[in-house]
């Protein structure tokens, strides 16, 4: 996979029959942080309640503290900050189309393939980033580790240096807990002020927002193919006067590529999230607009087309010796095996 073509949707990791794709493991990096003097705080993605069904934030914090973390907070706190910024932008009517910028994979899709739509992408940091800044404002010397179901978040943390210090997947966390013989105990506690826990579901951002700006239609779109179709409609002037919640994963974050592989029940996952979310916003201290703003620039893609011999060599390295081995990865927009080798 060529990095400047990739949008980090993670579908190659999900569908590859040879398990050829591996995700960089940051557990050792986090262990080094924990061995230092600074407090290390976890920002836990709201999809955790789906991945670890029936295990609430209090129980997660107990387990993570045994690993050495200072404290555990919900990324949904940052989501509350972000959705409030979206509301303010819509109220100002500065632009007739606003696309949510929570999903780093969607952001990359627009930055690389739809530069004319960039002006509609909300210039707001992601919930992960907003929460990390909020934590560091309250605990100035803290290190922040995000834990969630997303491959793209590792790239987002690396690209925007100094905000999030490390990213772990649920799978990495689960394996680490098993190594230390730490068991997660069942138990959840309902909190009325926790509406942003809805964020990892399709339409979840919309459900947390005040949808009362006259003249705007509020839409939720998930899945890369549907996002591409919507972005083409925007380019062609078909869509206008709307706020679009856009997620690259079908089902939004609870359909993330590194939700643990044994855990593939979208209806149950959705119900876990909805039943855990409250009806009111978290109590948060808002960050100033400058701190939470984020600029997105066009990313130029440059490719040199390999020769036929080079393509065949690449396919052999991938273990694709026969035509039957040449899986058509249509989910990630590869129409033929030789094109797969090219990228």
Outline where the language-model segments fall.
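Domain-start "cap" segments at the beginnings of catalytic or binding domains
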Residues: 1-3
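Terminal amphipathic helices with adjacent charged low-complexity linkers/tails
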Residues: 5-10
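Short hydrophobic beta-strand motif reused across regulatory alpha/beta modules
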Residues: 12, 21-22
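A structural motif detector for beta-strand N-caps
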Residues: 15-16
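Iron-sulfur-associated redox domains of electron-transfer enzymes in respiratory
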Residues: 24-332
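Single conserved hydrophobic/aromatic residue that forms the stacking wall/gate
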Residues: 332-343
């Amino acid at each position: 996979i060529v990095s400047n073509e990739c949008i980090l949707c993670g579908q190659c990791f999900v569908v590859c029959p040879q398990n050829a794709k591996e995700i960089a493991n940051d557990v050792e990096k986090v262990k080094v942080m924990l061995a230092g003097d600074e407090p290390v705080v976890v920002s836990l993605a709201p999809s955790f309640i789906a991945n670890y069904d029936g295990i609430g934030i209090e129980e997660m914090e107990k387990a993570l503290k045994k690993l050495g973390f200072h404290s555990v907070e919900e990324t949904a706190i940052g989501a509350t900050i972000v959705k409030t910024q979206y509301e303010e932008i819509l109220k100002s009517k500065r632009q007739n189309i606003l696309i949510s910028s929570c999903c780093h994979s969607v952001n990359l899709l627009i930055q690389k393939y739809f530069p004319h739509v960039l002006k509609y992408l909300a210039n707001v940091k992601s919930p992960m980033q907003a929460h990390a800044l909020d934590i560091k404002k309250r605990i100035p010397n803290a290190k922040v580790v995000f834990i969630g179901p997303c491959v793209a978040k590792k790239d987002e943390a690396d690209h925007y240096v100094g905000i999030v210090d490390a990213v772990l997947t649920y799978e990495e966390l689960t394996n680490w807990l098993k190594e230390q013989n730490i068991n997660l105990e069942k138990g959840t506690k309902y909190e009325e002020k926790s509406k942003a826990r809805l964020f990892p579901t399709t339409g979840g951002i919309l459900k947390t927002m005040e949808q009362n700006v006259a003249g705007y239609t509020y839409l939720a779109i998930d899945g890369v193919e549907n996002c591409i179709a919507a972005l083409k409609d925007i380019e062609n002037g078909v869509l206008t006067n709307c706020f679009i919640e856009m997620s690259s994963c079908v089902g939004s974050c609870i359909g993330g590529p590194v939700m643990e592989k044994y855990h593939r029940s979208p209806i149950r996952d959705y119900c876990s999230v909805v039943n855990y979310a409250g009806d009111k916003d978290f109590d948060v201290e808002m960050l100033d607009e400058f701190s939470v703003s984020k600029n997105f620039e066009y990313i130029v893609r440059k490719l040199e087309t390999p020769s036929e011999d080079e393509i065949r060599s690449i396919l052999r390295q991938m273990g694709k010796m026969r035509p039957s081995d040449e899986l058509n990865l249509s989910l990630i927009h590869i129409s033929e095996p030789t094109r797969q080798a090219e990228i």
